[in-house]
Amino acid sequence: MKQPIMADGPRCKRRKQANPRRKNVVNYDNVVDAGSETDEEDKLHIAEDDSLANPLDQDTSPASMPNHESSPHMSQGLLPREEEEEELRESVVEHSWHSGEILQASVAGPEEMKEDYDAMGPEATIQTTINNGTVKNANCTSDFEEYFAKRKLEERDGHAVSIEEYLQRSDTAIIYPEAPEELSRLGTPEANGQEENDLPPGTPDAFAQLLTCPYCDRGYKRLTSLKEHIKYRHEKNEENFSCPLCSYTFAYRTQLERHMVTHKPGTDQHQMLTQGAGNRKFKCTECGKAFKYKHHLKEHLRIHSGEKPYECPNCKKRFSHSGSYSSHISSKKCIGLISVNGRMRNNIKTGSSPNSVSSSPTNSAITQLRNKLENGKPLSMSEQTGLLKIKTEPLDFNDYKVLMATHGFSGSSPFMNGGLGATSPLGVHPSAQSPMQHLGVGMEAPLLGFPTMNSNLSEVQKVLQIVDNTVSRQKMDCKTEDISKLKGYHMKDPCSQPEEQGVTSPNIPPVGLPVVSHNGATKSIIDYTLEKVNEAKACLQSLTTDSRRQISNIKKEKLRTLIDLVTDDKMIENHSISTPFSCQFCKESFPGPIPLHQHERYLCKMNEEIKAVLQPHENIVPNKAGVFVDNKALLLSSVLSEKGLTSPINPYKDHMSVLKAYYAMNMEPNSDELLKISIAVGLPQEFVKEWFEQRKVYQYSNSRSPSLERTSKPLAPNSNPTTKDSLLPRSPVKPMDSITSPSIAELHNSVTSCDPPLRLTKSSHFTNIKAVDKLDHSRSNTPSPLNLSSTSSKNSHSSSYTPNSFSSEELQAEPLDLSLPKQMREPKGIIATKNKTKATSINLDHNSVSSSSENSDEPLNLTFIKKEFSNSNNLDNKSNNPVFGMNPFSAKPLYTPLPPQSAFPPATFMPPVQTSIPGLRPYPGLDQMSFLPHMAYTYPTGAATFADMQQRRKYQRKQGFQGDLLDGAQDYMSGLDDMTDSDSCLSRKKIKKTESGMYACDLCDKTFQKSSSLLRHKYEHTGKRPHQCQICKKAFKHKHHLIEHSRLHSGEKPYQCDKCGKRFSHSGSYSQHMNHRYSYCKREAEEREAAEREAREKGHLEPTELLMNRAYLQSITPQGYSDSEERESMPRDGESEKEHEKEGEEGYGKLRRRDGDEEEEEEEEESENKSMDTDPETIRDEEETGDHSMDDSSEDGKMETKSDHEEDNMEDGME
């Protein structure tokens, strides 16, 4: 079969193997095949016959090298190689011999090869030129004839047979001597050139088919390959660089330098090759890392010095690397209001001042209203109405801590801003302000399919807003301590008990603050409020009375639920007795080692180490039903449950709210964060750590408790519904016959009489039936309203809401109290059946409840209620209401309020089954994502299914990632793309923190502050490029690489020099320009314009060439820029000036590229971001568009050729 002639391979490719090892033999006759490492590369340096009887039937692997003495010209000897990728044209040296003679010498080859060479004709010659241009003939026929004639003679004599017999002897050791010169040439990259050895290995009689170079004795199968080899390697002219040892010529000095490395001893050679042939000349004095460019070292030094010269104009975050800054700007990470590191995205550092306010575009309306309040101007009704349409945002926790520290408030409050929540002139705690600050009052309800508010409800809300505005003005005008004057003003209630009167001083005069009413008259707040309250009372009289009958059913269901809970808990106790895990102090049994350890270490009252903590609770507290709760349960409930916050015997009530706030920010703090939290709350670090652990266990047990399934039993249908038929059609939501919310029953009971309220004390989970009865009874006889601001629960299956289930008689007496959140403060049974009050479509203002049946456009919302005044029959109660009957600093959970109905997710976001939080399915407002406040109103349109949001929700509580949730579906999912790697089985769940809270790579010794950084770092090991351009199909490791690459297709150039006006599409190019060319870029721009004018006048020169010639004549090249490099930068034959300009800009094309080992812990993210700027592919793409002009005076003065770039690409895994 005819041997296929292989085409020449591409020239500008890097050889894969740098150090192929070969064996040398003394004589061609004694060559024995050995395995060659370069067989796969198709690199045949010599090919020789096995000298076997039937050579055509034997597979040979010509891997051995002859001694140089075996051939006059080292025919088929060691072939010196170099690793240069570019072989540019040079002048020609003529060297000819007749192909006919060559073919005659090759008579031992197969007939197919003869046909190939006959086709060339006998006149085929090789022309080469010497420096003077003369032509000479070098007849190499004698060399070929001598060798091939000798070979044929040996084959006729049967030497091959004797060699075969000799090799088959078992007592003979075959030694393959190596020539001394071989050591100096091992590892020469040119040994891997497929394009110059087109004969595949193992070809029979392959040696006879080779054409040998007369200069270096390299063998080639085709004459064209030999011509190219001589042309590119052995021509000499004045512009080439010649190797003094082997006479190889190179077009670039850098190629010659790397080639000279191959002549060094093996140890030195390996060291220099690994160091990039000495190109990394800039070494860090701190850590010893070396860099090729001086500006790379400069930016690296900022890691050690902490300098961060780049600052984001939006969030004021600073960066040490321009690449990090560019990535931050490009990814729009600071668009939202909450940033990664606790910074408000409004140009104000959070926590810098208690007066810090939000000034982002989304809060522009709030800012305008705040300015009016600061100037003492009353708000018009239109502005007050506009406040209702301001979307609320989460308040940064740093602001929250500063506010508490400044004003001395220890309790927690709903952690939101919006309305006037975060825009108070004095930064007063948000709970003292707008009652609607907890929810998105102004959400575009029609967009989500809900009707708008009716005018009646709007009027009531306006009253509340006016009160808030005036309170804010009063706080602005008065000193901080003067706010206490507002605490004593309450309407007297004759039903209150005498001890309640001692809470506030009755001698404090009323504070009458002026406010503008509808008719423009100035009234006091009290008069105006009471007037509107009376109007709202009239609205309540239209409510139905069917809810009375539902109360009894709800009470019965609650009793059954509590019985089930107590029974299940007793069963759990009995089960734990039989387990072998018992406490060494109190001998109490536990189902496993983990609960046992937690009990022994932190909860056991017999443990001496925690007796001091439990000292206030040494006495066992009996409840009404005789169920005793020991100290352990008290501590557990005080630590885990919110119901302990208001207990008079809870010593930690001043700390729990702060702990909950920290817990909502980060559920798994490391040791450093725990220390900070313990200092902030004033508790021991071990206590804080255990609190976090118990909190997680508590929530997990609530979500997994099997006993909660029993709460899903439907309640009995209402036996005597007496709903007014005239009101039912106007209800926005049809009442449900079989299921009603227990919260509704509590609402009815809370306003029917004026008994003192029963404050929930710390109690165990075993709360008996009698206590519940007493609780319901006291609620049914109390004028002090219940709190409905946080009736959410994670433990209910059956709760539903009935908008028409409130009777006017029961609801018209007293307003609801929002100061006592119920979430996790009540016994399990109550919590399990009390979770849907938010959707009951009722809005109360002070003493008023406006029925949704009166407002058919949109269901009302109980979460808009804030009790600020009582009616004239109300005395001061024990709720510690400091401001108009409300305690603004009472303890509340971090995210108490549920979202308004207008903020519910679209239908596609409703989960089919709630698995992790049972019982939340019937009520959309209790969806899991609602517990994260900004997720309550940011349902991006880009994500079409609940599965998309479910995927995002995995990371919603991770510290530093909440800000990305505000950026919408596309940006947030792109952030998750960088954080997850399903193909390589890398997920956040599998990444474990070290003891110091860092994330360590399991393949190297690097650690990172964020798991996402570690996942991106893993790309360096796996080589995966997950981000692919859809236009040119190039792939990148990081998304911001793809973002900047896409600008090459779109033509976008967002970066512009303010001096010369030049624009850049890549941040790395822009940074390099500003760092090294800014000082003279204006002059360069003027020179470029002059060169263009001159080119237009001459008509035959390119402006770039003129500019370059002028630059060299002016000697503006920096030191170290050698003549050879000048020649490199000059245009060469066959290249257009445009290509020359692009190639000259290669020195800047590799901007900001850093090796993978350059990333530091402190600036790991910035180093990754910077890698975009240094990605050679991306920068080279930009250069192909002609973005850059040639800069010949770079500060570091190191221009690299295309071969340098490709080699570096291989080093950094970028190719």
UniProtKB/Swiss-Prot annotation:
InterPro entries: Di19_Zn-bd, HD, Homeodomain-like_sf, Znf_C2H2_sf, Znf_C2H2_type, ZnF_E-box_Homeobox. Pfam families: zf-C2H2, zf-Di19. GO terms for biological process: astrocyte activation; cell proliferation in forebrain; central nervous system development; collateral sprouting; corpus callosum morphogenesis; corticospinal tract morphogenesis; developmental pigmentation; embryonic morphogenesis. The modification Phosphoserine is found at residues 142, 356, 360, 364, 647, 731, 780, 784, 1122, 1124, 1203. GO terms for molecular function: DNA-binding transcription activator activity, RNA polymerase II-specific; DNA-binding transcription repressor activity, RNA polymerase II-specific; R-SMAD binding; RNA polymerase II cis-regulatory region sequence-specific DNA binding; zinc ion binding. Residues 12-24 have a biased composition (Basic residues). Residues 437-487 are annotated as: SMAD-MH2 binding domain. There is a cross-link at residues 391, 866 (Glycyl lysine isopeptide (Lys-Gly) (interchain with G-Cter in SUMO)). Keywords: Acetylation, Chromosome, DNA-binding, Homeobox, Isopeptide bond, Metal-binding, Nucleus, Phosphoprotein, Repeat, Repressor, Transcription, Transcription regulation, Ubl conjugation, Zinc, Zinc-finger. Its main location: nucleus. Sumoylation on Lys-391 and Lys-866 is promoted by the E3 SUMO-protein ligase CBX4, and impairs interaction with CTBP1 and transcription repression activity. Residues 780-808 have a biased composition (Low complexity). A zinc finger (C2H2-type) spans 211-234, 241-263, 282-304, 310-334, 581-605, 999-1021, 1027-1049, 1055-1076. GO terms for cellular component: chromatin; nucleolus; nucleoplasm; nucleus; plasma membrane. Residues 89-98, 1127-1149, 1168-1179, 1186-1205 have a biased composition (Basic and acidic residues). The keyword Repeat applies. There is a cross-link at residues 391, 479, 555, 611, 632, 713, 866 (Glycyl lysine isopeptide (Lys-Gly) (interchain with G-Cter in SUMO2)). Residues 644-703 bind DNA. Interacts with CBX4 and CTBP1. Binds activated SMAD1, activated SMAD2 and activated SMAD3; binding with SMAD4 is not detected. Transcriptional inhibitor that binds to DNA sequence 5'-CACCT-3' in different promoters. Represses transcription of E-cadherin. Represses expression of MEOX2. This is Zinc finger E-box-binding homeobox 2. The lineage of its organism: Eukaryota, Metazoa, Chordata, Craniata, Vertebrata.
